[in-house]
Amino acid sequence: IPTRFWLDVLAKVCGICLGLGYDGALQYDPKDVERVRHIVRKYPSALLWTHKTYIDGFVVPKILFDNNFPMPHFFGGANLNVPILGFLLRRAGGIFIRRSFQDNEIYKLSLKQYIGYLMEKRFPMTWSFEGTRSRLGKLMPPKYGLLKYVLEGAHHAGSQDIHIIPVSVSYDLIRDAEEYAREQSGTPK
């Protein structure tokens, strides 16, 4: 369970990271934020955001934190569980999952049970619906695996009122596009 201290640290890190590549000013509709607040406080909820660049994962938590939301548990790939970052994210509600675990029934069952527990307790959840970033500013095809587990978890937990909230993160400029072009021309990552 996230603690206030680690959520404060994560919010500070999100603000710093957003300021590295962009001016740090996030624009959003306060009316939409209030509508989402009402839903998240009343119903089990999942906020699914678009993923076009590295910093997308910082945008949603920063807006939620700045607007005094109950902070969501967020799903990310196991590749994010690196020293320091993994330590921080876990303590702020991060849940690292493998990219593929089709043959591991115990892993599937454990994940479904944990998601069911989060929904039963009405902890909001968030993740990138595309599963990975596009790096070009375009949307990738959605990955339905985690959403399927959320729906199954809701069913097993008896949660019939789950709300899926789409969140679009847009930019005037995608800085990852230049890096991606270099990688495609043969420059190593």
Language-model regions: role of each:
Residues 4, 35-37, 41, 90-91, ...:
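Arginine residue identity/basic-tract feature
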Residues 1-46, 51-62, 86-93, 112-113, ...:
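Membrane-anchoring hydrophobic helices of lipid-metabolizing enzymes
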Residues 15, 31-34, 68, 81, ...:
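Short, surface-exposed, charged/polar-biased interaction segments
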Residues 35, 53-57, 80-84, 103-105, ...:
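Flexible loop/turn segments at secondary-structure boundaries
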Residues 69-76, 113-189:
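Membrane-associated lipid acylation/remodeling enzymes share a hydrophobic transmembrane-juxtamembrane segment
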Residues 22-24, 56, 103-111, 138-143:
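Phosphate/oxyanion-binding active-site loops and adjacent basic polyanion-contact surfaces
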Residues 6, 41-107, 154-165:
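Catalytic core of membrane glycerolipid acyltransferases/transacylases, capturing the structured
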